[in-house]
A protein has these predicted regions:
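ATP-dependent carboxylate-amine ligase
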Residues: 14, 28, 48, 69-74, ...
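Beta-strand/loop nucleic-acid-binding surfaces
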Residues: 108-111
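Short, charged, surface-exposed secondary-structure boundary motifs
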Residues: 25-29, 82-91, 261-265
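Flexible active-site lid/hinge loop adjacent to a nucleotide/diphosphate
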Residues: 1-67, 207
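Glycine/charge-rich, flexible interdomain linkers and switch-proximal surface loops
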Residues: 56, 84, 156-158
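Residues at the C-termini of beta-strands that transition into short coil/loop
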Residues: 78-81, 92, 235, 255
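Acidic-glycine-rich active-site phosphate/pyrophosphate-binding loop
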Residues: 87-106, 153-154
Length: 302
């Protein structure tokens, strides 16, 4: 793009949604405020009487509201905050997804294990409300949606009638916020599967520039809290996490995904719960055909 808001002026949306602002892709910006400013450019192309839907829990909420008001947009906030127009009152994980309460809707069940995805669903509900569409049918349809491959899909390897391994495939991409969310959700899931061993497979988060080392090391405390039975890392930055934790957690590091692809089968056994999370460029998704082959082989042998 050559000019600010070039794309949004082509689209001329009636409703613009910003789900989050974080330090994702920060190597292309001077700081996080620049990221917030770049995202706020979507408001510049809004049609007259347009609506800006903004996450009320985000640190850049006030900045985004100010930018939206410059174009006289109607502000619609969504999130956990009490000031939200669409308020999340409860959001909890269970073994099969998430249960959410918002506004006057109680115990709505979604098939998304990742609470960030559930929060994004509430952003969609905010759009529906602004369009003044009936929500009942939409809620029924959304509750049937399943996570996509690489976006929190849950796969099960059945070894026999009593033993299985669960894989949470969040390998499509990662940034600092989504990585922390994935680890937090995995920790909640780990508590629900106490009898299972835990395996965390993480790849580097890319495009973080000079902040890369620090941001990766910020994951150390939550990984200590999860205390997985096995930590596998792919990339030079997650190797630094490995180096910090290898005295207390069983760890193996790989600089390239091709190395782990050759060895992954040796780590897979019954009664595990496994998380895959990393930037797309680290290639963790290349492990999924191996897992799916194991699923098929076991099904054929049953």
């Amino acid at each position: 793009m050559l000019f600010r808001s070039e794309l949004t002026k082509i689209a001329k949306p009636n409703i613009a949604v910003i789900t989050n602002v974080s330090n994702s892709h920060i190597q292309n910006f001077k700081n996080e405020k620049e990221i917030a400013r770049a995202k706020s450019e979507i408001f510049l192309g809004l049609e007259k009487n347009g609506v800006a839907i903004i996450n009320s829990d985000n640190d850049w909420k006030e900045f985004l509201i100010t930018e939206a008001k410059k174009v006289n947009a109607k502000i619609h906030l969504f999130g956990h905050s009490k000031i939200s127009n669409t308020q999340i009152k409860k959001l909890v994980n269970d073994k099969d997804g998430s249960t959410i309460c918002y506004d006057k809707i109680e115990n709505w069940h979604l098939k998304y294990l990742n609470t960030t995805q559930a929060e994004n669903v509430i952003a969609s509900i905010s759009v529906i409300k602004e369009l003044k569409l009936p929500t009942k049918k939409v809620l029924t349809l959304i509750s049937k949606l399943k996570p996509l491959s690489g976006r929190g899909e849950k796969l099960i390897i059945n070894f026999n009638s009593k033993q299985k391994t669960i894989i949470i495939d969040d390998s499509y991409n990662a940034n600092p916020a989504s990585m922390m969310a994935a680890l937090h959700n995995f920790n909640n899931l780990r508590i629900k599967y106490r009898e299972f061993e835990t395996v965390v497979i993480i790849g580097d988060m890319l495009e973080l520039g000079k902040s890369s080392t620090k941001i990766h090391l910020d994951l150390v405390p939550i990984l200590k809290n999860i205390n997985p039975n096995l930590l596998l890392t792919v990339g030079k930055y997650t190797k630094k996490i490995n180096d910090k934790l290898n005295l207390t957690i069983k760890c193996h590091s790989y600089y390239e995904i091709s190395e782990l692809v050759k060895e992954i089968k040796q780590y897979i056994k019954p009664n595990q719960i496994i998380l895959l999370k990393g930037s797309n460029g680290t290639g963790l998704w290349k492990l999924m055909p191996i897992f799916k082959n194991i699923i098929q082989e076991n099904a054929n042998a049953a």
